[in-house]
Amino acid sequence: MTKSELISKLAERFPQLLAKDAELVVKIILDAMAKSLSRGERIEIRGFGSFDLNYRPSRVGRNPKSGEKVHVPEKYVPHFKAGKKMRELIDSGPKQHKVLDRVTG
């Protein structure tokens, strides 16, 4: 699902919400999440999952085209861990998803 598909689903689910307002809501949520992660904060959405940062130390990499060794600096990368309810939903298979789509709209 893309950001635009999420905005469309949100606007469909809540007809009183204009598409531009749905877009603003999604943008505000994603911006808040990105800012929290950039401050090193953990994000937890119960039933959905959690986002945190994993540290990657500096290392010597290789340019795949030339074979030349290059220094790759240390960095933090975002990491998502699915929550229990999300894992159960995924494990239930596509058949169950179709039932949930009918129920949730």
UniProtKB/Swiss-Prot annotation:
The keyword DNA-binding applies. The keyword Transmembrane helix does not apply. Keywords: DNA recombination, DNA-binding, Transcription, Transcription regulation, Translation regulation. GO terms for biological process: DNA recombination; regulation of DNA-templated transcription; regulation of translation. CDD domains: IHF_B. One of its GO terms (molecular function) is DNA binding. One of its GO terms (cellular component) is cytosol. It comes from the Bacteria. This protein is one of the two subunits of integration host factor, a specific DNA-binding protein that functions in genetic recombination as well as in transcriptional and translational control. Belongs to the bacterial histone-like protein family. Heterodimer of an alpha and a beta chain. This is Integration host factor subunit beta. It comes from Nitrosomonas europaea (strain ATCC 19718 / CIP 103999 / KCTC 2705 / NBRC 14298). The lineage of its organism: Bacteria, Pseudomonadati, Pseudomonadota, Betaproteobacteria, Nitrosomonadales.
